[in-house]
């Protein structure tokens, strides 16, 4: 069973997350030959203050 775990900075819309799930799932089907019913995708949203970029939080960078 292919499983993708995706970490993203919080703030994406439900539609954007749905698109990520659909496209990542399709990519896993194509790459592994696994049936779509066996594919799992987990999106973990990370608060901006908990995401560091070059030593600074994403919140401080205005992301």
From Swiss-Prot:
Instruction: List the InterPro entries.
Output: 4-OT, 4-OT-like_dom, Tautomerase/MIF_sf
> For this protein, what is the EC number?
5.3.2.6
Active site, renumbered: 2 (proton acceptor)
Tell me the GO BP annotations in alphabetical order.
Answer: salicylic acid catabolic process
Task: Identify the enzyme class.
Answer: isomerase
Gene3D superfamilies of this UniProt entry? Macrophage Migration Inhibitory Factor
Q: Which UniProt keywords apply?
A: Aromatic hydrocarbons catabolism, Isomerase, Plasmid
Q: Is Cytoplasm set as a keyword in this record?
A: no
The pathway this protein participates in, as annotated, is: Aromatic compound metabolism; salicylate degradation
A single GO molecular-function term is: isomerase activity
Q: Which domain of life is it from?
A: Bacteria
Pfam families tied to this protein? Tautomerase
Q: Per the record, what are the reactions this protein catalyses?
A: (2Z,4E)-2-hydroxyhexa-2,4-dienedioate = (3E)-2-oxohex-3-enedioate
Subunit comment:
Homohexamer.
Family named by the database record: Belongs to the 4-oxalocrotonate tautomerase family.
Q: What does this protein do?
A: Catalyzes the ketonization of 2-hydroxymuconate stereoselectively to yield 2-oxo-3-hexenedioate.
Q: What is this protein called?
A: 2-hydroxymuconate tautomerase
Gene expressing this chain = tdnL
